[in-house]
Amino acid sequence: MATRGPTPDKARMGLPDRWLHCPKTGTLINNLFFPFKTPLCKMYDNQIAERRYQFHPAEVFSHPHLHGKKIGLWIDLTNTDRYYFREEVTEHECIYHKMKMAGRGVSPTQEDTDNFIKLVQEFHKKYPDRVVGVHCTHGFNRTGFLIAAYLFQVEEYGLDAAIGEFAENRQKGIYKQDYIDDLFARYDPTEDDKILAPEKPDWEREMSIGMSTQIDNGRPSTSQQIPATNGNNNQNGNQLSGGGDNSKLFMDGLIRGVKVCEDEGKKSMLQAKIKNLCKYNKQGFPGLQPVSLSRGNINLLEQESYMVSWKADGMRYIIYINDGDVYAFDRDNEVFEIENLDFVTKNGAPLMETLVDTEVIIDKVEINGAMCDQPRMLIYDIMRFNSVNVMKEPFYKRFEIIKTEIIDMRTAAFKTGRLKHENQIMSVRRKDFYDLEATAKLFGPKFVQHVGHEIDGLIFQPKKTKYETGRCDKVLKWKPPSHNSVDFLLKVEKKCKEGMLPEWIGYLFVQNLSDPFGTMKATATLKKYHNKIIECTLLVDNQGRPKEWKFMRERTDKSLPNGLRTAENVVETMVNPVTETYLIEYVNHALRVLKRAAAAHRHHQIHQQQLHEGEPEARRQKL
């Protein structure tokens, strides 16, 4: 029986091909993964002339790119055991897991990927503060494929964003086009604008001089030919979605004078700019993403002070304002250029380096006795103001900045004639938030009639939280049970069963499943939405049991469906709904809890003050 692990004879087979100058490690990915090439035990040291190229397992655990975090799970994807002893891993109180994969241009199978994801999920649930170390021979293609698949399926990244995230943290990332093509074929087969692999790295071109050419299983390679590159020198390792798609319209074309940015260089620059302004280290749309309010998280309302606002049935855009130029970024990170919209400072100069979060709506207003459409931008949060980062300020301060530094300055400029209403492409207002006590009033007819557009829910915003990019579990969105919905990718197929008439079925897909999340009957109306993103609600019976999915509308502002976790959370709100009555009753309960907590806090402060004031008197009496 062959000896497991390295032996002198196995070490004499030589270093892995092209290993010597391959970068040792990447950096932390999503605060969870740490990619690296396979380390080698000390039996290989005599084959490495310069000590700086030696790479032992112990070096991984102490690497500065871990920023003090500990690796708790080590996943070895190589197809051999000759490189190091597993005890060199387990002696660091780390779980070692071997997942043999062929490599050499062969992507991980669906089963391999599912096993990897399950393993990481179970570990991360048990040890949320530990890191997962992953390596194949070089730590690029197999490693990148599996990490990107995990980010896509579990963390709900877009596929291009998942691949890009790995590229940013592992020296341009996956460099073999076959692996990228396989990712798209498996997870996003409808995407035409696929990412191109970066140019093959210099170290990959090198052949090991004086060493036998090896592959993972320790046998000599049958070919020493270096594959040709695709000629693409994509420095970022990914392409942002939306490039070249000129059919997309701002607000579905309801507002004239706004055009999509067709200059790809300018678009990429602007996308990188707002990503930097937000300190956002991922790909795609950098805005804060609220979560659905459910019976499972409604207790957050009693844990800290919240403000409440209505949820407008408009479209969300991040707006970048700089020196007279105004750009809008939708949830697909598409860039639009807005003309004839001015933002000024107190002295009338153009506002600089400002980034705000908005909803754009079409209000119904009465002008000279006739009802007219009034485009309006509602600013509800701010990340940058005049080059100053305000993301770490509490929400109530950011809310005040919107009024005093943006809305009031525009109002003053209109009064002095510096700005003219007739020259503005749309109206701009601050979207109001109210103390939590006002929740019930937002359901009242007086408020609903006052708002000139459709309301489709409420937003609950903590007063003292900073602005967070990406998913924020503290910011809650509530919709009436009848309005709760999931965004699906629709696939319409014709099914023919023997002895029966053909039937058209709509299959509803979310990002994280190769199997449909649900189905619905494909009517003639529905067929035209094949391969498009549609919004659906779930009809339930009077006992809360699911009946069927119902089509609501096409989501022209989105190019990807919801992720699995989001879809499951929304379904929970449909099956166990938070009704208007339940919400108002719970808000009143939360207010009572907060009031008691505030009273207890004041009582504690008074008590501490009395103790402090009594100390000098007690000392005098003792003397």
Curated annotation (Swiss-Prot):
Residue stretches of biased makeup (Polar residues): 213-229
Amino acid composition bias (Low complexity), ranges on this chain: 230-239
Region (Disordered): 213-243, 603-623
Gene3D superfamilies: DNA ligase/mRNA capping enzyme (3.30.470.30), Nucleic acid-binding proteins (2.40.50.140), Protein tyrosine phosphatase superfamily (3.90.190.10)
Active-site residue numbers: 136 (phosphocysteine intermediate), 311 (n6-gmp-lysine intermediate)
Reactions performed catalytically: a 5'-end triphospho-ribonucleoside in mRNA + H2O = a 5'-end diphospho-ribonucleoside in mRNA + phosphate + H(+); a 5'-end diphospho-ribonucleoside in mRNA + GTP + H(+) = a 5'-end (5'-triphosphoguanosine)-ribonucleoside in mRNA + diphosphate
Region (GTase): 241-585
Top-rank taxon, per record: Eukaryota
Claim: Nucleotide-binding is one of the keywords in the record: yes
A Gene Ontology biological process term: dephosphorylation
PANTHER family reported for this sequence: MRNA-CAPPING ENZYME (PTHR10367:SF17)
Name of the protein in its database record: mRNA-capping enzyme
